[in-house]
Amino acid sequence: MDYLDKLTHLAQVRGEINIRCEFQGEWQISHQEKDAGKGIFHLIEQGECWLTLNEKQFHLKEGDVFFLPQNQPHSMHYSANKRADIPTKKSHQGLFELHQIGRGTPDLKMFCGNFYYQQDALLTASMPEYLHINLCDTPIHPLVQLFLQEAQKNDAGTKSVVDALSNVLLIYILRHAIQQNLIEQGILFALQDKRLNTALIAILQQPQNDWHIEQLAELATMSRANFIRIFQQHIGMSPGRFLTKVRLQSAAFLLKQSQQSVLAIALEVGYQSEAHFCKVFKNYYQLSPSQYRKSVSL
């Protein structure tokens, strides 16, 4: 499992594409919700529009995806000039909730979806405020075409296919953002630093090890003091705090996805005492491991 797979597992990412928009004429819609545990994205199938985020405007056209990792309030409109919101007519079309404005042939066709993840996940803390990418000339484009084809169907399992494709879409978006140097903070940024990469991957892959600063600094071929300083600058926390987060987020994933006992999970992620593990886990999640397991299985 590589680092991006590991981080998406720790974040417990779950994607869905649930809204299709067909807008005609002069229109504007607003999204006022803010949710640290949910990201939202807009995928332009046909046409063009404008999106305003924190007074900054973006021109979206066919093939664009606009991803807001923390679901920031924003508005979308047919032109660069903002107007009053226009109510949408809502109905259902196959898998999707259909939002319509206007009665003629749509000028804009757009899909909207969500990514859900654990709050305070290392992955989401590394994401920028937004990502605006045109997918037409990228390796992601065939995936988008496959999604558009699947979205027209109503076959058995289509929803599972569409939601699975949304998870793949997130990986491609993040991969593209990393390759284009659009990530400037957190774990994804730090992993691009050759000095820190080896130490970070060692922690991600083996959080159960009894890691010491000296060992990690040696892996990074840096002095102890320099390692701590650079680590803090890149990730915004100490190596010890980072290790604790990886252990606890690994434990949360196992509590949700496995039937292992709390003790077995504690040992697997690096705690030698179930009591100590439960105390640290509850301080972090405000729930005991057993309470957490029940809450995510509802």
Swiss-Prot record:
Residues 194-295 form the HTH araC/xylS-type domain. InterPro entries: AraC_lig, Homeodomain-like_sf, HTH-like, HTH_AraC, HTH_AraC-typ_CS, RmlC-like_jellyroll, Tscrpt_reg_AraC-type_HTH. PROSITE patterns: HTH_ARAC_FAMILY_1, HTH_ARAC_FAMILY_2. Keywords: DNA-binding, Transcription, Transcription regulation. Pfam families: Cupin_6, HTH_18. One of its GO terms (molecular function) is sequence-specific DNA binding. PANTHER family: ARAC-FAMILY TRANSCRIPTIONAL REGULATOR, RCS-SPECIFIC HTH-TYPE TRANSCRIPTIONAL ACTIVATOR RCLR. This is Uncharacterized HTH-type transcriptional regulator HI_1052. It comes from Haemophilus influenzae (strain ATCC 51907 / DSM 11121 / KW20 / Rd).
